[in-house]
Amino acid sequence: MAALVLSLLLLSLAGHSSASWCVCKTGLSDTVLQATLDYACGNGADCNPTKPKQSCFNPDNVRSHCNYAVNSFFQKKGQSPGSCNFDGTATPTNSDPSYTGCAFPTSASGSSGSTTVTPGTTNPKGSPTTTTLPGSGTNSPYSGNPTNGVFGGNSTGGTTGTGINPDYTTDSSAFALKNSSKLFICLLLIASSGFCSFLML
């Protein structure tokens, strides 16, 4: 029985640990985050959920919209190396950034409303498209003209950190709960392995 429980715990941990997301780095100005947001939304990210009256619009601040956009871009690129860089403004994470009412996708199929843009044509924003991954060469969030939040960013420099902490500046109760459940599972594994060795005596 203990072996069955241990096997199920290991399987659930293995399945959970494979997920990866992309979020904007903390400590960056709203202007930098807006440029990153605009780049991601203009190059294939599904930013529709960050539009008004959509599931990820609130909290309405640049950081939370940037997080959703870079993650969508990262998933659309198949979590490929370099697709979560954005010239150093984003970073991959294994901690799910989803929050109440806003689920961040973990795969390209998890993003809805995608559009295919043919390289060399114009995208819905009207600027030339590129096939270069963000953070490499001269194609970065800082080349081109930002659209001041057309795809959901708040370019007014509003307060970040509102709502239930989607900007990740401090640990929220959801992260604390997630981390405490990992600790509980680790303790359970240690206790069960000690229990199993005691039974073998």
Swiss-Prot record:
Q: Which residues are glycosylated?
A: N154, N179
Ranges for the region named Disordered are 107-164
Gene assigned in the entry: PDCB1
Q: What is this protein called?
A: PLASMODESMATA CALLOSE-BINDING PROTEIN 1
Q: Any remaining note in the record?
A: Overexpression of PDCB1 results in callose accumulation and decreased plasmodesmal molecular diffusion.
The protein's organism comes out as Arabidopsis thaliana
Q: How does it sit in the membrane?
A: Lipid-anchor; GPI-anchor
**Tissues of expression:** Expressed in the shoot apical region and in young leaves but also detected in the laminar and vasculature of mature leaves.
PANTHER family hit by this protein: BETA-1,3 GLUCANASE (PTHR31044), PLASMODESMATA CALLOSE-BINDING PROTEIN 1 (PTHR31044:SF61)
